[in-house]
């Protein structure tokens, strides 16, 4: 009996969904993608009570939070390891991933931007988001000072790269960040855009993207 494909609930524009798509692609997992708007779809709460995306349904197991999903995938699918074996390299890689997941992305999301509605103009809201992104990018740029490897912590893609790539993409395409301030991150972005697994995961390449309709 064939095993059912895992189902990824997400949205084209979500950088959290974007990073999980990259991880699934890198590991060669055949999955089903279901687009969802967690703010308007009442049924999604049955899958994820906190109503954030993404969520992964793997048989009778449901998991939400992109970092938890990627670590689950890492354990279930050993091909193309995303977590380095060396403990210091692993520590740096996880630090980069967590800066993105904890200190940048949550502060640019709809939940936070929505708090500004009525109090700040769109331009003022954008400036707030840009400050958060710039703060995180400055930190990562310093952490990677002197980095001469192909990717964040080596010549293979790891978890930090998987988290960083969507954040840089959003910074450029949604939040008008001047990437000339971040030469290392700009170089990494160029490297990511050459990888088929990253290209396939891009927001504009998803079936729910406006460009796909």
Swiss-Prot record:
A single GO molecular function term of this UniProt record: glutathione transferase activity
EC number assigned by the record: 2.5.1.18
Keywords from the named record: Cytoplasm, Transferase
Subcellular location as annotated: Cytoplasm
Limits of the GST N-terminal domain: 4-81
UniProt superkingdom: Eukaryota
Name this protein carries in UniProt: Glutathione S-transferase
Catalysis: reaction(s): RX + glutathione = an S-substituted glutathione + a halide anion + H(+)
BP GO terms, sorted: glutathione metabolic process; L-phenylalanine catabolic process
Biological source species: Triticum aestivum
Transmembrane region(s): none
PROSITE patterns with a match to the protein in the record: GST_CTER, GST_NTER
Domain called GST C-terminal: residue spans: 86-211
Function according to Swiss-Prot or TrEMBL: Has a glutathione transferase activity with ethacrynic acid and nitrophenyl acetate. Has low glutathione peroxidase activity with cumene hydroperoxide.
């Amino acid at each position: 009996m064939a095993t059912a494909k895992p189902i990824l609930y997400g949205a084209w524009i979500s950088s959290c969904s974007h990073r999980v798509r990259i991880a699934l692609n890198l590991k060669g997992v055949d999955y089903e993608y279901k687009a969802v708007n967690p703010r308007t779809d009442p049924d999604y709460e049955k899958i994820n009570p906190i109503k954030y995306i993404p969520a992964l349904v793997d048989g009778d197991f449901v998991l939400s939070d992109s970092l938890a999903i990627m670590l689950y995938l890492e354990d279930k699918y050993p091909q193309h390891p995303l977590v380095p074996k060396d403990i210091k390299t692993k520590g740096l890689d996880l630090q980069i991933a967590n800066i993105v997941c904890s200190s940048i992305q949550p502060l640019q999301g709809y939940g936070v931007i929505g708090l500004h509605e009525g109090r700040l103009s769109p331009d003022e809201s954008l400036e707030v988001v840009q400050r958060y992104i710039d703060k995180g990018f400055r930190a990562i740029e310093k952490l990677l000072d002197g980095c001469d490897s192909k990717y964040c912590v080596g010549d293979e893609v790891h978890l930090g790269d998987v988290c960083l790539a969507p954040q840089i993409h959003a910074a450029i395409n949604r939040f008008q960040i001047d990437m000339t301030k971040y030469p290392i991150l700009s170089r990494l972005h160029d490297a990511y855009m050459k990888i088929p697994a990253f290209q396939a995961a891009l927001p504009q390449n998803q079936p729910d993207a406006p460009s796909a309709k």
